Amino acid sequence: MTPLEKQLTEQNQQLVETIARLTQTIEAQNRRIEELLERLNKNSRNSSKPPSSDGYQKPKPKSLRESSGRKAGGQDGHEGHHLSMEQTPKEVISHMPGGCAGCPLYEECRGKACVAETRKVADATIEIHVTAHETLTVTCPLTGKNLRGSFPKDVKGPIQYGKKLQGLIVAFNTVGAVSANRIKEIFGSVFGIPLSTGTVSSMVCGFAEGLNGVMADIREQVIDSPVSHFDETGIRVDSKLHWAHVASNDSFTYLYLSGKRGHAGMEEGAVLPYFHGIGIHDCWKSYWKYDIMHGVCCAHLLRELQGVTENHPEQLWPRHFSALLLEMKKRKEAAMSTGQDCLEPDILADISDRYDAFIRLAYEENPEPVKVPGKRGKPKRGKLLALIDRLRDYKASVCLFAENFVVPFDNNQAERDLRMVKVKTKVSGCFRTKSGADGFLKIMSYIGTARKQGVNPFTAVLLALAGEPKACWAE
């Protein structure tokens, strides 16, 4: 080999190595750009992010629901609701024709006038009702002793707030998510009652403490339920991240606070360790540690699949998979309308075959990453392959809603039960103390349960203040 040939060979080898390094760098940068674009494109419609994280630039509405073919608004046969005209008025004001004013026969005509039309105005009268309790002393004519009456147990001081005012304050602060300072302003201006923020906090905390026994009963009801929903959401408490966990069904709501999101937080709630029914959740890995029957929230899967479709429009499998899930849901609803409790075996077999076929297509469109020579460790597989793995590994739990009609399609029940927690933190930003967060979750557990039993929140609060919180539901 001549010196020139040797030089050209060395240069060629150097170029090959340089191109290989550049190719690896470009591939790594492309992966990083793809990850950043996916993160940038995430919103509440194509991921598990809450709507509050969308900011002012809301994505265009693109519902996953299909058109029902029905016109918008109330449907034929729908029972409407309006302000009733049947209420008995406490005051009647009659209006004579304007031209009769000043007529000498005005009073005579007024006595003969007939009612042409009645219109009613419903308004509220705001007044403070003060009840004075006094003890009486008498001298017994039989014994000669001086006897004195006693105050009711709930009348403890020279002056105090009544139960309706306490109930209103608790309802404002929890159900209404009104801050203590705003409550102080409202009660001062509307009722003329002086309140301090400390008094508001004290009332709410005292009310929560009285619910300890009820919380134990609600927890037992959720544990004994054949199907329960589980979820969690992050909240700031005393400048630290905590987690509000929920375990609920269509009749009871159990909320509790924990410093942990995963298995430790679930153990702290003492629901899942004793639960033996079907647990519906969002596929968070910690739930799979419990030896129960699991149902996966398909609404979460649809949002994730929507995200894949938007970020990787060239891939076909997410569209097919979304269509399959929605078809299963539609078939279930049609079967339930005819009184069935599961889909026919041949339909389930066809669904299973197509499910497996779409999983195979997903792996074909997303091959395993190739290990780079000289680079330590396994190559990073990415979130897309992780989603496909989940759909493959938990197929039985994803399809459970079609095999057992007791199992719902989604985990909306748990998400609805957590919604007021997010509303409260959106208004207040955070909870200053752990006891305050604990108290709020107890109260919302009780009120959420009362709502499911058909009892309005204010009535439920008054029942609890009267010492009868369990009156909200039948034993």
What are these regions, as identified by a protein language model?
Residues 1-160, 201, 230:
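Short, flexible loop/hinge motifs at secondary-structure junctions
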Residues 6, 13, 27-28, 136-139, ...:
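Catalytic center-proximal scaffold of phosphoryl-transfer enzymes
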